């Protein structure tokens, strides 16, 4: 007789290729028999999304940086994730993506200007379309201190339509 294990399972395969100025990678992840990352799940499928028995996620990542810094050409990071959820009453899917840009040594050695934006995975209906971004400038006034002012914002955060946020932060790092 065959027995089906009631234990949760998580199987994944990663593959990547990296060179000094670029990298690409992919991952496939299959979770089944009740393994749960519930806050990443897509909206209800004629029932409770918590009842999802299995899902398959695929993630793609890549980055590239120029041969030299200070040229005005940014390094670039990109990513895309897609997840298909199988539930007793149907199927659903969710996508997420991001793009990051980073300029190094534009004004002074060791400074960085960065921008990132993207759409995180949502567990809500299609009326909710979250979007997030951040902008920052990191600089070193001396060899022991790095200062990084940044602003960030997001729309439809935490799966709530109109749940928008905006903020600023000023990080200071001391090295002794």
Q: Could you describe each region identified by the protein language model?
A:
Residues 131-176:
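Predominantly the C-terminal beta-signal and adjacent terminal strand-loop region
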Residues 13, 17-26, 32-35, 60, ...:
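Repeated loop/turn-to-beta-strand initiation elements of outer-membrane beta-barrel proteins
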Residues 1-12:
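Short, small-residue-biased leader/transition segments that mark boundaries at the very start
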Residues 32-38, 68, 82-88, 107-109, ...:
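Gram-negative outer-membrane beta-barrel proteins
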Residues 13-19, 60-64, 80, 99-103, ...:
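Residues on the lipid-exposed face of transmembrane beta-strands in outer-membrane beta-barrel proteins
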Residues 26-30, 76-82, 99, 113-119, ...:
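Transmembrane beta-barrel strands of outer-membrane/channel proteins
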Residues 7-9, 54-58, 91-97, 129-133, ...:
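Residues that define the transmembrane beta-barrel architecture of outer-membrane proteins
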Residues 102-145:
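C-terminal hydrophobic structural anchor segments
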């Amino acid at each position: 007789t065959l027995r089906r294990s009631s234990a949760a399972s998580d199987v994944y395969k990663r593959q990547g290729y990296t060179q000094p100025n670029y990298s690409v990678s992919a991952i496939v992840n299959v979770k089944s028999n009740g393994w749960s990352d519930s806050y990443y799940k897509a909206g209800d499928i004629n029932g409770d999304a918590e009842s999802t028995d299995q899902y398959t996620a695929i993630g793609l990542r890549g980055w590239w940086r120029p041969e030299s810094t200070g040229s005005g050409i940014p390094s670039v990071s990109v990513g895309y994730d897609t997840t298909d959820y199988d539930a007793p009453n149907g199927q659903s899917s969710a996508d997420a993506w991001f793009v990051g840009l980073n300029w190094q040594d534009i004004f002074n050695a060791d400074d960085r200007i960065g921008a990132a934006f993207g759409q995180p995975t949502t567990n809500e209906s299609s009326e909710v379309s979250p979007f997030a971004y951040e902008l920052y400038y990191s600089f070193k006034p001396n060899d022991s201190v790095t200062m990084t002012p940044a602003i960030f914002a997001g729309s439809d955060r935490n799966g709530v339509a109109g749940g928008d946020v905006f903020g600023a932060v000023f990080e200071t790092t001391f090295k002794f």
